[in-house]
């Protein structure tokens, strides 16, 4: 893997810097590095493809070296270099695609394609120039089972989940109380609602709670917490749990009271915040517990317009609603996760779809992330680490 990264890095630098008019002295070190790559690859043969619709291609390396000059690089020099660069880039692209479409239930962190296995040979180690990539570093840690942490800016840790629970219900569905939520990616939105606006609740207050268990532990998380759930702030028709009827939800938004958020690890509270919004920090957690209240305003605090919205008896045409939004902006995870700010999952999925790669023993059809993270396993983690690393290498050359 580190050889593939070095190839890609060298080719990227060469494509960017070996241009007509450049002083040779400014790129002499790069050209020496480029020539070392050519010397190492010359005389070798590789084969890529042969899975799904990815065509089989044979690669033979027999290229001349770039010479020295005391002057600027001229058009002939650059054209010679460009021909070599283009062939090498095409080769790296195909090696990456060949690797991205393969998977294995055992030792999925190791190269799976014949071409990358061959590049892992000792004689190609002379190509190693710069392995400072975060992906390469973490791939090596995972390969040696020495992982200490993998950083993502916005980890897609929540499988998609959109549903509701009713704490009070009737066949007519005209006086409901309960909770509805939408969890996806790195965001939770949850709303508590009461058609009667807590008219008969103790102290005219309804208590709501939403608990989310993560599939992997997160640490050092920067989180945004807002006293609103905008996705549940407009009218909608909702299917009943048994699918036999529908009910009408017409929210009027209140600000939540007595908001408390707990971050737990193995059942123990690690961080606890009360009535605090904006940016918060969670140190170490695998479970999030959100609790909040809907409080009916005292009659003397209601203007006539507000009192008309929430009568003391049915029918209840407007439904008191409170909500919260929790968004993980950044966190460290000891497992490999898709990241909202990166394109690795999209790159891997696109290549697998483009070449009609058959469903293998590890990944779900279409690389469905909700399925993948819901049933996350060590085998999936190993394979994800490998294909994401290859995707990051490919993205250096292929946009």
Curated annotation (Swiss-Prot):
UniProt: Ca(2+) binding residues: 266, 286
Alphabetic keyword roster: Calcium, Capsid protein, Intermediate capsid protein, Metal-binding, Ubl conjugation, Virion, Zinc
Superkingdom of origin: Viruses
Entry-linked SUPFAM superfamilies: A virus capsid protein alpha-helical domain, Viral protein domain
Any one of the GO CC terms: viral envelope
The family this protein is said to belong to: Belongs to the rotavirus VP6 family.
Protein name: Intermediate capsid protein VP6
Organism of this sequence: Rotavirus A (isolate RVA/Equine/United Kingdom/H2/1976/G3P4[12]) (RV-A)
Classification of source organism: Viruses, Riboviria, Orthornavirae, Duplornaviricota, Resentoviricetes
């Amino acid at each position: 893997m580190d050889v593939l990264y070095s190839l890609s890095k060298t080719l990227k630098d060469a494509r960017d810097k070996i241009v007509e008019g450049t002083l040779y002295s400014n790129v002499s070190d790069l050209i020496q590095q480029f020539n070392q790559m050519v010397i190492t690859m010359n005389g070798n043969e590789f084969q890529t493809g042969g899975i799904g619709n990815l065509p089989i291609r044979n690669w033979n390396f027999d290229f001349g070296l770039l010479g020295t000059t005391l002057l600027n690089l001229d058009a002939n020099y650059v054209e010679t270099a460009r021909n070599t660069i283009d062939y090498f880039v095409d080769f790296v692209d195909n090696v990456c695609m060949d690797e991205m479409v393969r998977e294995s239930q055992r030792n999925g962190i190791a190269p799976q394609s014949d071409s990358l296995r061959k590049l892992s040979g000792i004689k190609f180690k002379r190509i190693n120039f710069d392995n400072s990539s975060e992906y390469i570093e973490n791939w090596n840690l995972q390969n040696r089972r020495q992982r200490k942490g993998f950083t993502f800016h916005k980890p897609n840790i929540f499988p998609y989940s959109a549903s509701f629970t009713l704490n009070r219900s009737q066949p007519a569905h005209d006086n409901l109380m309960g909770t509805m939520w939408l969890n996806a990616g790195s965001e939770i939105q949850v709303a508590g609602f009461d058609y009667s606006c807590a008219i008969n609740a103790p102290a005219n207050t309804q208590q709501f709670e939403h608990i989310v268990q993560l599939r992997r532990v997160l640490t050092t998380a920067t989180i945004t917490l807002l006293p609103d759930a905008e996705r549940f702030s407009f009218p909608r028709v909702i299917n009943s749990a048994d699918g036999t009827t529908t009910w009408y939800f017409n929210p009027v938004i209140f600000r939540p009271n007595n908001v408390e958020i707990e971050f737990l690890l193995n059942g123990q509270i690690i961080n606890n915040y009360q009535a605090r919004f904006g940016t918060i920090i969670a140190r170490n957690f695998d479970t999030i517990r959100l609790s909040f209240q809907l409080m009916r305003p005292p009659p003397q605090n209601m203007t006539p317009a507000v009192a008309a919205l929430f009568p003391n008896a049915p029918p209840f045409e407007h439904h008191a609603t409170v909500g919260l939004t929790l968004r993980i902006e950044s966190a460290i995870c000891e497992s490999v996760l898709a990241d909202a700010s990166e394109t690795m999952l999209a790159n891997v999925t696109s290549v697998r779809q483009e070449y009609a790669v058959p469903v293998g023993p590890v990944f779900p059809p279409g690389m469905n992330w909700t399925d993948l993270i819901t049933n996350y396993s060590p085998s999936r983690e190993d394979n994800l680490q490998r294909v994401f690393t290859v995707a990051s290498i490919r993205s250096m050359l292929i946009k």
